[in-house]
Amino acid sequence: MMLPALLVLVLITVLPFIMLIAMSFAKVRLLGGVSLSMNGFGNWSDVLTDPATWHSWGVTLLFFVLAVGMEMIVGTVLALILNSMRRGQSLAFSLVLLPMFLAPITVGLLGNFLLDPTIGLYSWVMESLHLVGAHQSVFGSQTTAMLAVTTLDMWEWAPLVALIVLAGLTSVSPSVLEAASVDGAGYLRTLFSIVIPSILPVLLVALLVRSMDAVRYYDIVHITTGGGPANTTWVISLQLNEKVQATAVDGITTLIGQSAVIGITMLVFTIIIANVFVRVLDRRGLMK
Amino acid sequence: MDKTQTDTGMARRTVLSAGLGAGLGLAALGLAGCTPSAKTSGSGSGWKQFSGTTINFISENTAPSAAIAANSKPFEDLTGIKVNITQMALENLVQKVKLDMSGGTSQYHVVYADPYQVLAPLSQGLTDLNQFVNDKKYPPVEKGLADFIALDAAGRFESKSKLYALPYDCPTMIWMFRQDLFDKYKSKMQADLGFDPTPSGKITWEQYYQIADWFNKNAKADVPYGTGHQAKQHDSLQCDFSNVLWAYGADYFDVPDIGTVGSQNPGKSTLTTPQALDAAKFYDKLLKVAHPSSTTWDWDGLGNAFAAGQVAMCPNWHEYAATNEKSLPGKVGYSILPTGPKRSANNWGGTGIGINANAKGNEQGAAWLFVNWATSPATQVMTLKSAKGGGTPTRTSVYDMAEVKKAEKRPSDMPNMLTASAVLEAWKPENIGLRPKVATWNQLDTIVYTNLSKMIAGSQDPTTTMQAMASQFDKVNG
């Protein structure tokens, strides 16, 4: 009964994963069909001693903290606002969710358009508010480029956090909130003493989902900054892609083996992050 | 590199043929003898032999491909072959072609073979077109291979014995400037700067800098900045910088013919020569007076900014002339790029189209018919006229056509031809700029534009930048 499903699973996940591991220990040639010639730990040592790869990991971690942090805060605030609305909640909810349904590449293109210093609406607003100089692009400055791509990611994915948190908020017992109100607890006291603790498992799930995704961030940064300026937004996915595109001096051997190593390290990082969150949930008895 | 044409007809052609023959090593001249002279595409036999076949053509999203995609019906009527055209950014194309060639099958039968990012690293995945050129069962290449401009640079790698692609487009970097603003301010600028600022090959890069700076300080009412550059951390940054590098007498490698047929053994880089360091220092200085958004523009971004009146001048690919004429009709002039201590260098960005070696049977034949048709003079004239943006013909004969010559002056129904005199000058051997055709170019390209991006962002000084590039080049090339 389960066999067909297992076979499909093997085909689409296990075999490619095994291939990925094999490639990480091999020189990969593509022309005329994929062929591997074992290379020991050559790819691993090349990647692990490559300053560019470590730099891109640093950039990724910065993005990770900024993006996930902003998404959690903004998403939670959005959910609280939506939850408190008595009228028009459905309409507002639909509008808030819209960015989430856009392809990331579209978000990047939108960002390029809206933040274009010549024709971009957001650029015009920021220039009017003296937040940026005349004709300055936020994507062109080392100090603002990361913030810009992070904000675009937040714009797209904070709604997902809002959706998850909103689901959690509906589970907060009205009688408990009523009791807090009767006891004279203010909004902030109620929020931090009752609401947040009640939805903590949901918040951690949202954090887990977004964290796993943030490591793979690629589309928006690719289309907006290309990793620049001066490599300030060169995330690990761009580094991986760079290796995929590269060819060795013989014109035949690719550097896909090195990109496989980077892919595996990304996977390991994601697993570690996921495990940390799961342990936190488990320690607090929230996994049940 | 590529192109042709002029006011003096034969004289221009003679100059170009001689120039390309000598400077670009056009093996085409030698091959011409074994190429059957052809009639017109569409005439003769052999076009219908693969009727009913469907082929796929993958191309960068360039003006010629947009024009052909919008008007491929003549090919389908002529051959009965259905052609699907997919267009995308070059970096995505490279990835798709590489994966396609690795599969043993061919999803894409006709491939836009960028000489640096596709042809050099993947030449072994492309079919040698000589088998079709010399096979009588196929319609001959109209006017022969000798009619092509830059056949070696666009179509060969390492050896002149094999031909992997036929030249398909040939954008070249030239100096685009607001003629109306130069006319308006010429006398004042000349008085202030002490030289005639009229754009031409006589203007030095240092003077270009001074002109840009002058616009910044004296013409804000008309244009925000004097110069703009495609200085995003992207392939475009390397293209823009290369013009200056060559103008200063430096190069990436010191290997003969590395820009035409290429090499798999480029050896040590030459990016730390005094000339290279001077070029980097100047480029760093130039970018300091450029439009601040230059660091976010690739060629498209720069083209749009110029068309939007953001800069008075810029170096960009000549195929943007069509866009300029729509946005700034009659207001844009064209010249070869300024000269450096050594020469004027104008980056050639031409590309050929080739056939995936994995294509089977009828697909190969049908693909060849498409390659032959798409690069034929008649098709190139069609793309020149296209409202989709205009082509950049790769046939000498096209530039000699009366209607094409007429289009060199306004009003022109082939706006790209307004750049003809500049481009013709740019293609002369002494002015052409050819990037090194090596298998590792994708890696080297990234090294160049990443380090340059650090330099113009102020994170690295020019000397450190060039030293970093050189050491990384040498590491990649062993």
Question: Whereabouts are the PLM-identified features?
Answer:
Chain B
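Short, polar/charged alpha-helical segment
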Residues: 62-82, 180, 448
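Hinge/lid segment of periplasmic solute-binding proteins
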Residues: 42-47, 115-174, 240, 333-335, ...
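N-terminal secretory signal peptides
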Residues: 1-11, 22-29, 373
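Glycine-centered hinge/linker elements that transmit conformational signals in sensory
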Residues: 207-216, 244, 248-296
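C-terminal capping/gating helix-and-loop segments adjacent to ligand/active sites or protein-protein/ligand interfaces
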Residues: 34, 294, 412-472
